[in-house]
Amino acid sequence: MDAEKRLFLKALKEKFEEDPREKYTKFYVFGGWRQSARKREFVEAAQKLIEKRGGIPFYNPDIGVPLGQRKLMPYKVSNTDAIVEGDDLHFMNNAAMQQFWDDIRRTVIVGMDTAHAVLEKRLGVEVTPETINEYMETINHALPGGAVVQEHMVEVHPALVWDCYAKIFTGDDELADEIDKRFLIDINKLFPEEQAEQIKKAIGKRTYQVSRVPTLVGRVCDGGTIARWSAMQIGMSFITAYKLCAGEAAIADFSYAAKHADVIQMASFLPARRARGPNEPGGIFFGVLADIVQTSRVSDDPVEQSLEVVAAGAMLYDQIWLGGYMSGGVGFTQYATATYTDDILDDFSYYGYDYITKKYGGCNSVKPTMDVVEDIATEVTLYGLEQYDTFPALLEDHFGGSQRAGVTAAAAGITTALATGNSNAGVNGWYLSQILHKEYHSRLGFYGYDLQDQCGAANSLSFRNDEGSPLELRGPNYPNYAMNVGHQGEYAGITQAAHSARGDAFALNPLIKVAFADPSLVFDFTHPRKEFARGALREFEPAGERDPIIPAH
């Protein structure tokens, strides 16, 4: 590839205002923290708030290591034109990132067929498209916090929960035609024809409700509350819509179906030492995250599809899960941003895509052998490392060894998965890249960064049921992955790459793919990077705000 065509050059020139090839630079000439408009804003805000805090000291960037001795870099969000400050990519400062997680956590999918069978077989009540529509109207009153069965019940202010609703989807085209379009997630309209047929075949004639519990519920309570909130309102809505007696025995079957038997949560329950219930980030399988991201519906570019999943996963797993839930700190942001800013991973991945197209014929064109893994991963890894050698500004951009290791290995893994259509081959491309990188630089990142990479190849084909799980079924709680940044989002992207290569409509669960194709969601899951950029530019309007119940401000 011509050096001047590197995708990351524009970003590097804007970040540093120097020739990216220049080997020498200056320090202590940038004005310290004052070079950053956002830091100046932080200081001004903190000074005003000290009095409100009763004089308790507050934010002071002069405490600790001197900030701004080097260039405080802005970041170009990859595949966009947005140039943003690093602070605005911290999830606490980015409403879009928060809503990305809110929209996942507040989602629960519930099968309707068990409840319909109870109605018809136990109670002798006919279920028709008309009664389903009546039920859907009822649940859209009850789910946000409206009362339906009892008097003297307090209710939730609608302006607090405007984002809450329920919809329905089915693989049965005849039934879908009869459902009120306000309540339907229309597979035929939202997916390309070939993908729609794959999904409908997988779903069959079954019918599912998607509950979007209020964002505010997830914030005040937790992910484990979501299915319970949904189930309670489902039960009340069935009682109301089908005029049932609240105390009869069959109601217990509705409760069991809505809370347990027919419930699909976005994340599995975690062990006690993680102290989290269902629908929390640590339980989201990589295949599930790949299905949550919707780029494959709207883009024919398999690299773009993969990179959007990487960005989503890096933000959720590295920034929120490991950086927040698990470590309790404010760091880890730059582990994630390395994968979705400045077009660097994009450049490495498109290089790999061009390589496999010329050598093997493109996506899903070669069997997943170790020779193939070694060839592709080595080629892409050496390309990436050569860029760090050639452009010192690139080295400064990815100032940490584990940033460079993660980005280079992600490109190697994605490319290998694209060529083979196999996620296991892809993750082995990642592992090999890490080992090659360590040979090249004698180190990667912090102590223990590459623990999982040293043993990963052997584990990837293990007979032990947890170690040998397909990449789609692994997640942040998989053995060796549980507390290590700079890996998990990339694994999710490698998962997507394999399925993009094969033209699959979904990676793991077609129900989740359909649920997040819903255009009524607050966050646009077709383009996570663009949404993160909107959040950084303060253009994104989130849900879950409390303005209706607090003084004007």
UniProtKB/Swiss-Prot annotation:
Binds 2 coenzyme F430 non-covalently per MCR complex. Coenzyme F430 is a yellow nickel porphinoid. Methyl-coenzyme-M reductase is activated when the enzyme-bound coenzyme F430 is reduced to the Ni(I) oxidation state. Pfam families: MCR_alpha (PF02249), MCR_alpha_N (PF02745). Its EC number is 2.8.4.1. It is found in: Cytoplasm. One of its GO terms (molecular function) is coenzyme-B sulfoethylthiotransferase activity. It comes from the Archaea. Gene3D superfamilies: 3.30.70.470, Methyl-coenzyme M reductase, alpha/beta subunit, C-terminal, Methyl-coenzyme M Reductase, Chain A, domain 1. Keywords: Cytoplasm, Metal-binding, Methanogenesis, Methylation, Nickel, Transferase. Coenzyme M binds at Y335, Y447. Coenzyme B binds at R228, K259, H260, R273. Coenzyme F430 binds at Q150. It catalyses: coenzyme B + methyl-coenzyme M = methane + coenzyme M-coenzyme B heterodisulfide. One of its GO terms (cellular component) is cytoplasm. The modification 5-methylarginine is found at R274. One of its GO terms (biological process) is methanogenesis. Pathway: One-carbon metabolism; methyl-coenzyme M reduction; methane from methyl-coenzyme M: step 1/1. Is methylated on C5 of Arg-274 by the methyltransferase MJ0841. This post-translational methylation, despite being not essential in vivo, plays a role for the stability and structural integrity of MCR. Its cofactor is coenzyme F430. InterPro entries: Me_CoM_Rdtase_asu, Me_CoM_Rdtase_asu/bsu_C, Me_CoM_Rdtase_asu_C, Me_CoM_Rdtase_asu_N, Me_CoM_Rdtase_asu_N_sub1, Me_CoM_Rdtase_asu_N_sub2, Me_CoM_Rdtase_Fd-like_fold. NCBIfam families: met_CoM_red_alp (TIGR03256). Component of the methyl-coenzyme M reductase (MCR) I that catalyzes the reductive cleavage of methyl-coenzyme M (CoM-S-CH3 or 2-(methylthio)ethanesulfonate) using coenzyme B (CoB or 7-mercaptoheptanoylthreonine phosphate) as reductant which results in the production of methane and the mixed heterodisulfide of CoB and CoM (CoM-S-S-CoB). This is the final step in methanogenesis. Belongs to the methyl-coenzyme M reductase alpha subunit family. MCR is a hexamer of two alpha, two beta, and two gamma chains, forming a dimer of heterotrimers. This is Methyl-coenzyme M reductase I subunit alpha. It comes from Methanocaldococcus jannaschii (strain ATCC 43067 / DSM 2661 / JAL-1 / JCM 10045 / NBRC 100440) (Methanococcus jannaschii).
